[in-house]
Swiss-Prot record:
This is Putative membrane protein insertion efficiency factor. It comes from Aeromonas salmonicida (strain A449). The lineage of its organism: Bacteria, Pseudomonadati, Pseudomonadota, Gammaproteobacteria, Aeromonadales. It is a peripheral membrane protein. InterPro entries: Membr_insert_effic_factor_YidD. GO terms for cellular component: plasma membrane.
Length: 82
């Protein structure tokens, strides 16, 4: 089932895509995680909505630093509501 995308989600995803296409290639591959932090942010915003998605992406960005081991770190699935 497809869910609707709010204007705020749409703008956030487009800004991240702009970063991926223009800025990221200039900086080179630096992310220690799979999926990359920018892809994680897009998936989190699409899956959880703008507020929780940005929160999850912010937490992920704080973990991505030179002392981090990195590795596979997917977006958590939403909890089911009964």
């Amino acid at each position: 089932m497809a869910h609707s995308v709010t204007p705020l989600q749409w703008v956030a995803v487009k800004l991240i895509r702009l970063y991926q296409l223009i800025i990221s290639p200039l900086l080179g591959q630096r992310c220690r995680f799979t999926p990359t932090c920018s892809q994680f942010a897009i998936e989190a915003i699409r899956l959880h909505g703008f507020i929780k998605g940005v929160w999850l992406a912010s937490k992920r960005l704080l973990k991505c630093h030179p002392l981090s081991e990195g590795g596979y770190d997917p977006v958590p699935q939403p909890k089911r509501r009964n």
